[in-house]
Amino acid sequence: MSALHSLRTHAVSIRAVRKVYGDPESGPVALKRVDLDIRDNEFFTLLGPSGCGKTTLLRMIAGFEFPTEGEILLYGENIAARPPFERPVNTVFQHYALFPHMSIAENLAFGLESRPLGRSLGKAEIAERVREMLALVQMERFADRRPGQLSGGQQQRVALARALAPQPRVLLLDEPLSALDLKLRQAMREELKAIQAKTGITFIFVTHDQEEALTMSDRIAVLSEGQVQQVGPPEEIYERPGNRFVADFIGETNFIEAELLQRDGPLALYRGPGGEAFEAAARDGLAAGARVCLSIRPERLDLLAANTGGGLPCTVESQVYLGTDLQYRVRLADGSLLTVRTPNGTARRFATGEAACLAVAKDSASVLLD
């Protein structure tokens, strides 16, 4: 792919961006050196714990912060030094910042009447755009109400409609669901994804919630300590984490220190600390005897009766009822503790202190080198 074609298919490109507050040589570093390409029309999520730099990066795309070094390209054009009102992007904030003295329709119209970019709209065109946006978020019948008369979920829809009304090329969403209750948050995930698909606008979504990222995103960038740890589709991030941080941050996992025994094509055999054998993908550049860390998700393990052959002997240390699942902590013969999660009602239930056999699904381990 040519560089020109690549620029055209990327909505946002982050090039060697570094952000330091205060003195560039000695001040606190928010972003160390970030390179990212966000595709046109995709739902892209910046995911990470508090303080990882995800919100700082979003604010720099919006123009509320400026990079110490590097470029921010919007469809190939460097906008790193431009003020927010000169960027064809809009932001939906965690706190929706609706004007309390205006009706819902007036909130939407305000941004269209004062838009700094693009041609001015007439009153009839503004009214039609407001109707279209309220219909998009299913809020037409609330057009004359004030924000204080709406629920949190309804205010979130209005904030989204207001941000979409000027037809930005990129929409930035800064943890917009965090103030909603669980049921409403789950419903809004589906709505946001559907609206993004319908409008065709690139969405860049910031969250620390792994479930939000996994269920909504086309691709995810996982950040930690000002650096991008891994970029990929949700399934790749979860099933094939690039390093120990990603494996630990996304969902739950078991870490097992192991040694490479032998390689057989795309697979390899690894030995755990108690002599247990684990099969996992082979990694280039590793010779027999190399030390690695294996990551195995709890749902890839299964508990069987103690007299079942072929598994690893273990003892159930504890069990927790989670509704849809049962979660066990089991101890292997070498003393290591592993977490096992099984669907509730599909298998026998083990008691605390009971001997059992741990079965490991084939090719269920990920090999981590750091």
Swiss-Prot record:
Signal peptide positions (record): none
Topology with respect to the bilayer: Peripheral membrane protein
Gene3D superfamilies according to UniProt: 2.40.50.100, P-loop containing nucleotide triphosphate hydrolases
GO molecular function, one term: ATP hydrolysis activity
EC number, as in UniProt: 7.6.2.11
SUPFAM superfamilies referenced in this protein's UniProt entry, alphabetically: MOP-like (SSF50331), P-loop containing nucleoside triphosphate hydrolases (SSF52540)
Compartments in which it is found: Cell inner membrane
Keyword terms of this UniProt record: ATP-binding, Cell inner membrane, Cell membrane, Membrane, Nucleotide-binding, Translocase, Transport
Ranges of residues in domain ABC transporter: 12-250
Residues the entry annotates as binding ATP: G48, P49, S50, G51, C52, G53, K54, T55
SMART domains: AAA
InterPro entries in the cross-refs: AAA+_ATPase, ABC_SmlMolc_Importer, ABC_transporter-like_ATP-bd, ABC_transporter-like_CS, Mo/tungstate-bd_C_term_dom, P-loop_NTPase, PotA-like, Transp-assoc_OB_typ2
GO cellular component, one term: ATP-binding cassette (ABC) transporter complex
Listed PROSITE patterns: ABC_TRANSPORTER_1 (PS00211), ABC_TRANSPORTER_2 (PS50893), POTA (PS51305)
Enzyme's top EC category: translocase
PANTHER family assigned: SPERMIDINE/PUTRESCINE IMPORT ATP-BINDING PROTEIN POTA, SPERMIDINE_PUTRESCINE IMPORT ATP-BINDING PROTEIN POTA
NCBIfam families: potA
UniProt similarity note: Belongs to the ABC transporter superfamily. Spermidine/putrescine importer (TC 3.A.1.11.1) family.
Subunit structure: The complex is composed of two ATP-binding proteins (PotA), two transmembrane proteins (PotB and PotC) and a solute-binding protein (PotD).
Role summary: Part of the ABC transporter complex PotABCD involved in spermidine/putrescine import. Responsible for energy coupling to the transport system.
Name the record gives this protein: Spermidine/putrescine import ATP-binding protein PotA 1
Species for this entry: Pseudomonas aeruginosa (strain ATCC 15692 / DSM 22644 / CIP 104116 / JCM 14847 / LMG 12228 / 1C / PRS 101 / PAO1)
High-level lineage: Bacteria, Pseudomonadati, Pseudomonadota, Gammaproteobacteria, Pseudomonadales
